[in-house]
Amino acid sequence: MFSLAVLREAISILRGIGIVESRHGSGNYVSKDPGSSISMMIKAMLALKSTSKAEIIQVRKVISYSVCELIMDRGLTKEEVADFQSILDGMITASKEEFAEYDRIFHRKLMLLTDNTLFRTLMEPIGEAYLELIPEVIGHTDADSRKALVDIHALLISGLVDHDREKCKAYFEKHYGFVEDGLEL
């Protein structure tokens, strides 16, 4: 049997890491957004240099490939393909700042298509940390480089539509190679 003091301490720790939230006069509840605590932890790890940009990219690459595997298993609807094409069209004419936002929208849409709440909860904070690096990468690009990035993103959609794992793998090598070069890793 636990003492009340031990239970309070455990709840305090869970609240501190964002898993539990306390509502005055109502009690303690499991947080609806545990991903935010993971995101804060990743940012702290970066600030304390206990992780690196390269490690974030490595984890993101593995997770992104898993996202694509799940999407290939379920397939893309014509409407989803059209949505991605609209994002790609926006990327073509976008400024550097707008391009980074379109990239965020593109990758978030991929993540949401997994239809897996736990996967999204785990991936979103890593994606946020990764996407904070994108403006730095885009900042080093010219119009031709951004056009090449649009083509790389189009390759992924083509791979997903065709259920072609090799195309998707080629996308990941090109995309993350571009990111690593932009961050000079």
Predicted regions and their residues:
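Hydrophobic, amphipathic alpha-helical faces that serve as interaction scaffolds
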Residues: A47, V59-L76, R104-D142
